[in-house]
């Protein structure tokens, strides 16, 4: 549509980043003349059409929230999405009230992979980053959480190859359900868990 051929493969490199970093990426790779605003409009139109009837929750979402509450842990969301989009998803799924904090991309200066969003999440949750786990589905998110001093756990989704960040992972699970089952059976020295896209 824009004359640049297929662009979908770029999602792997921009997953988890905010709008500013996403635009920077496309201009660096396709030149300063790249019509990012038109691209974004088309992307959003396609996305909203896709999710018009709601977005299915990730496997184990409700189970993990229940386990975290039973263990008395604080729960936060740290997503590069807009506040409007994130809150809408959480309320539609009926889980908004589980969360002690919701930090979105428009609330911080530097998006993932910079640590700002997770630093702010821990500040709002009133926990030391070393006592918090970040559940992530993106390489940029893992780097962000690690940079903030948190314990990053990868739950692969679109990006299955995690070799670039395996050395900084606290753990890796196939799904939220697997993490919930593990958490039920162990005692960890943590006070909070923050996650990125709970319903995407």
Stretches found by the model and what they are:
Residues 5, 33, 96-100, 128:
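Conserved H-loop
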Residues 18-33, 89, 121-122:
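Helix-loop "lid/cap" segments that line or gate small-molecule binding pockets
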Residues 133-171:
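Acidic, Mg2+-coordinating phosphoryl-transfer loop and its flanking beta/alpha structural elements
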Residues 64-90, 145:
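Substrate-recognition element of Asp-dependent hydrolases with the DxDx(T/V) motif
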Residues 94-104, 164-184:
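Structural recognition of alpha->loop->beta junctions
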Residues 196-200:
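Conserved small/polar residues in nucleotide/adenosyl-binding loops
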Residues 111-139:
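Conserved Lys-Pro-Asp/Glu-containing loop-to-beta segment of HAD-superfamily phosphomonoesterases
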Residues 5-10, 25-63, 71:
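Metal-dependent phosphoesterase signature
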């Amino acid at each position: 549509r824009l004359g640049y051929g297929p662009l979908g493969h770029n999602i792997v490199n921009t997953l988890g980043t905010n709008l500013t970093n996403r635009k920077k990426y496309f201009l660096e790779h396709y030149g300063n003349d790249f019509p990012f605003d038109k691209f974004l409009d088309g992307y959003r139109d396609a996305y909203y059409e896709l999710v018009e009837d709601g977005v299915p929750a990730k496997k184990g979402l409700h189970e993990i929230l229940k386990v975290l509450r039973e263990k008395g842990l604080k729960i936060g969301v740290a997503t590069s999405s807009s506040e409007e989009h994130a809150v809408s998803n959480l309320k539609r799924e009926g889980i908004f009230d589980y969360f002690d904090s919701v930090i979105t991309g428009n609330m911080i200066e530097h998006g993932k992979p910079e640590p700002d969003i997770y630093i702010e999440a821990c500040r709002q949750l009133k926990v030391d980053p070393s006592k918090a786990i970040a559940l992530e589905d993106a390489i940029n998110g893992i780097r962000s959480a690690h940079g903030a001093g948190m314990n990053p756990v990868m739950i692969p989704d679109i990006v299955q190859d995690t070799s670039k960040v395996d050395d900084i992972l606290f753990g890796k699970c196939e799904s939220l359900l697997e993490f919930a089952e593990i958490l039920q059976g162990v005692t960890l020295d943590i006070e909070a868990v923050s996650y990125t896209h709970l319903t995407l």
